[in-house]
């Protein structure tokens, strides 16, 4: 086997504990960054948020079963890439995994940069009295590009320092962030709507220069934007319509699956399942508590109206800035309950650790997929090299350098019409779609694994896990795959809304958004070109790629 791969063993070390993997899963479905960000955009739905949160979690349990099972069978760095290439064969697995984990993640870079400024830079500058700079960072174009470059620098450094260092960073961030969230929840459940209204008007003016009466003006702006999403209730079909947007936040408890070649005890299915399931359960409960706290003190209707007012402007539907001229970050809104600047600074600082503990998820998982492909000789051997910290540094550069270009195109919306419509921004709406398509491929691989790789399955720790004689991994793959199929159909066609084929529907990534579709197709074509190009190149050198992708590499 040693002459098949780049070297005899990958050289990656199992330096993470199961608890480290739990924290990574917990941060991957981050209630603050991904959660608060996604919730704020979901102001125009008819299904209740609590209902949608619970329903999505039920389906995602089957995702966790699928990934925990595959990890136990093949606990190798590269995750989806390794599983699909070994179960399907090289071409399909490579194209789906490389598009999902490599090219699509470039599109997430400016989103991480946007969250850095909205969750950390702008609110901190505001409570520190730097009003002009805070307002500058909340603007479009250059402020977004600058914050994205800062985010990229942090992510690159923390990943380059290796898995042990990253584990410490995320662990300390976990404790600090949880303390901040606990303070936030206490403030929400002990405050009153009357105190919040007064505090909002005072702080919005003092910190960000809002006009007097900002609270009432926000109510009007949000109402005009169509803010209607309820905290709970709604017909079942309306709840299901909410899910394709909500999963931008919680579809990722498996995000660390590509790293399990570096996790101790990864062949233990129960430990794998527990780590991801506890993360999903904890985040779901925290989400419900957050919603209830918001409803008590901020007021649910006002929260949605503030969100609608901001995104109606940010998405270009109106040109006038909202009464609160910065994103309505829930932590910022909560500290408006007090005029004590020290308390505001401490809470915002503690809450910022939700971003710092999570930021590495941007590229950390992806580097292992690129590394695994290079180890299989489907990319240059240099990409499989490790630095002294055990990081595939060249694989990371293949994420970072293109991400800078993508972030520039996104921040300045290159190619947009004079009225601001279209442009590169619309192409990035496929950021979730491309990953979900890859997950669908992995779900299919899980379904067929017991039948096409019988010896491997029968020798695995999950061989006896069956329901009515059917492998649990197959049943779970069918359910999770069905859920993904629903999401993909909704994103592509919006069938319950666009009965006449009009508009882009609720999600903005239907077939009507040609930029997004073209971008995805180009990514798949590029992946196919890399695969078949390297396969032909290796064949000329006497290397059988089909043989390589029947073997499982040694870590």
Please tell me what each predicted stretch does.
Residues 82-89, 219, 277-359, 379-427:
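TM-loop-TM module centered on a large, flexible mid-protein loop between adjacent transmembrane helices
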Residues 1-48, 60-65, 200-218, 531-555:
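Membrane-interface "cap" regions at the ends of multi-pass membrane proteins
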Residues 12, 142-143, 155, 172, ...:
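C-terminal membrane-solvent junction of multi-pass transporters and transport-like membrane proteins
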Residues 51, 184-186, 190-194, 425-438, ...:
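A generic transmembrane alpha-helix motif of multi-pass inner-membrane proteins
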Residues 16, 145-211, 251, 273-282, ...:
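Membrane-interface loop-to-helix entry segments
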Residues 16, 20-34, 148-154, 208-297, ...:
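Hydrophobic, membrane-embedded alpha-helices of multi-pass small-molecule transporters
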Residues 41, 61-152, 362-366, 485:
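Hydrophobic transmembrane alpha-helices that form the core helical bundles
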Residues 18-19, 142-149, 263-285, 356, ...:
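Loop-to-transmembrane helix boundary motifs in multi-pass membrane proteins
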């Amino acid at each position: 086997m040693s002459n098949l791969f780049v070297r005899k063993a990958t050289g990656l070390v199992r330096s993470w504990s199961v608890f480290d993997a739990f924290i990574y899963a917990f941060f991957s479905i981050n209630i603050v960054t991904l959660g608060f960000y996604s919730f704020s955009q979901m102001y125009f739905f008819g299904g209740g948020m609590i209902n949608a949160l619970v329903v999505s979690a039920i389906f995602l349990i089957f995702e966790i079963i699928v990934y925990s099972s595959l990890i136990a069978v093949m606990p190798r760095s590269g995750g989806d890439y390794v599983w699909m290439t070994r179960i399907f064969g090289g071409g399909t697995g490579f194209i789906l995994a490389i598009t999902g984990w490599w090219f699509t993640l470039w599109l997430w870079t400016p989103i991480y940069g946007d969250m850095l400024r909205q969750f950390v830079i702008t609110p901190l500058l505001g409570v520190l009295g730097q009003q002009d700079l805070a307002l500058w960072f909340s603007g479009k174009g250059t402020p977004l590009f600058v914050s994205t470059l800062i985010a990229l620098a942090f992510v690159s450094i923390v990943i380059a320092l290796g898995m042990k260092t990253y584990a410490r960073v995320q662990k300390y961030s976990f404790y600090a962030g949880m303390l901040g969230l606990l303070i936030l929840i206490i403030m929400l459940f002990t405050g009153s709507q009357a105190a919040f209204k007064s505090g909002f008007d005072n702080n919005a003016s003092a910190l960000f220069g809002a006009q007097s009466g900002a609270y009432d003006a926000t109510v009007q702006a949000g109402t005009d934007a169509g803010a209607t999403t309820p905290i709970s209730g709604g017909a079942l079909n309306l709840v299901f319509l909410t899910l394709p947007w909500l999963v931008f936040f919680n579809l990722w408890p498996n995000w660390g699956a590509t790293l399990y070649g570096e996790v101790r005890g990864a062949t233990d299915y129960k430990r794998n399942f527990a780590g991801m399931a506890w993360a999903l359960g904890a985040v779901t409960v925290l989400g419900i508590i957050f919603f209830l706290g918001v409803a008590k003190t901020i007021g649910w209707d006002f929260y949605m109206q503030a969100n609608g007012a901001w995104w109606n402007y940010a998405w270009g539907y109106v040109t006038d800035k909202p009464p609160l001229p910065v994103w309505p970050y829930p932590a910022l809104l909560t500290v408006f309950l007090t005029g004590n600047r020290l308390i505001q600074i401490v809470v915002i600082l503690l809450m910022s650790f939700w971003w710092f503990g999570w930021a590495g998820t941007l590229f950390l998982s992806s580097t292992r997929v690129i590394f695994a492909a290079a180890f299989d000789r489907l990319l240059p051997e240099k990409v499989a090299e490790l630095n002294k910290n055990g990081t595939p540094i060249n694989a990371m550069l293949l994420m970072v350098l293109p991400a800078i270009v993508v972030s520039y195109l996104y921040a300045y919306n290159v190619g947009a019409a004079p009225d601001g419509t279209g442009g590169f921004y619309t192409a990035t709406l496929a950021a979730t779609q491309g990953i979900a398509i890859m997950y669908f491929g992995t779900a299919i691989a899980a379904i067929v694994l017991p039948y096409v790789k019988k010896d491997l399955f029968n020798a695995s720790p999950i061989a006896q896990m069956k329901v009515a004689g059917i492998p649990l991994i197959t049943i779970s793959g069918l359910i999770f795959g069905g859920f993904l199929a629903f999401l993909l159909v909704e994103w592509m066609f919006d069938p319950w809304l666009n009965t006449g084929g009009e508009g882009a529907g609720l999600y903005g990534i239907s077939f009507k958004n040609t930029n997004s579709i073209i971008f995805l197709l180009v990514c798949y074509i590029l992946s196919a070109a890399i695969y078949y190009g390297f396969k032909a190149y290796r064949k000329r050198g006497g290397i059988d790629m089909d043989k390589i992708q029947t073997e499982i590499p040694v870590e």
